[in-house]
Amino acid sequence: MSAKNIDELIALCKRRGFIFQSSEIYGGTQGLYDYGPLGVELKNNIKNSWWKSTVYERDDVEGLDAAILTKQSVLKHSGHEDTFSDPLVDCKSCGERFRADQVPDYCKKEDLTEPRQFNLMFKTNVGPVDDGSSFAYLRPETAQQIFTNFKNVVDSTARNIPFGIAQIGKAFRNEITLKSFIFRVREFEQMELEFFVVPGTDEDWHKEWVESRLVWWENQGVSRAVSYTHLRAHETGSY
């Protein structure tokens, strides 16, 4: 989408009460948006539809609503603390910072610093003491608490594999480069399902879930061709 069309879309969303720049009257906060009267209803309709099709209409999925603040050791053991990062460069000419693979044309190569890794997780402290024991993160995705609560869900529901755990919730990423309106932001919501299967049955389950999700997207008015062919080969590895 061209910059002109994006600007027109942003203006329309604000004018009709879908999305506003967060803290706009104080100059706004880059990468943060507030959903207005129509926006919150649209978002809730999408979430309710997804939850209904993923949890309520199936007998093999349980729901979860986990905490946003995440213990440091969880994200250390998951690998996020060491690898959830993007390469960052500084332009010595303009003074701006960019992802190494998204440097604008007006910055010359010789003006860039060597790339260094920038962790995308927001850090915070839990409790009144600012020391190592209180260190935590705002979760960068909704998956980790599903895994850490796996045994709790199994013990409390007597579930056996195959079954899934679904969650809708906020996630936070301190993105270096923000672009395309709400398509890359620092605070957003995810609708996530982790489905656990018996080894050797993963391909069959994958096909079933792909078809199920395509039907759901069609019910939202999105063409099956658009929702499926957008996934390129290198994007499907974790799916």
Regions found by a protein language model. Give the residues of each.
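Short, hydrophobic beta-strand segments
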Residues: 31-35, 191-196
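A generic structural motif
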Residues: 195-203
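Surface-exposed helix-capping loop/turn segments at secondary-structure junctions
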Residues: 56-62, 219-226
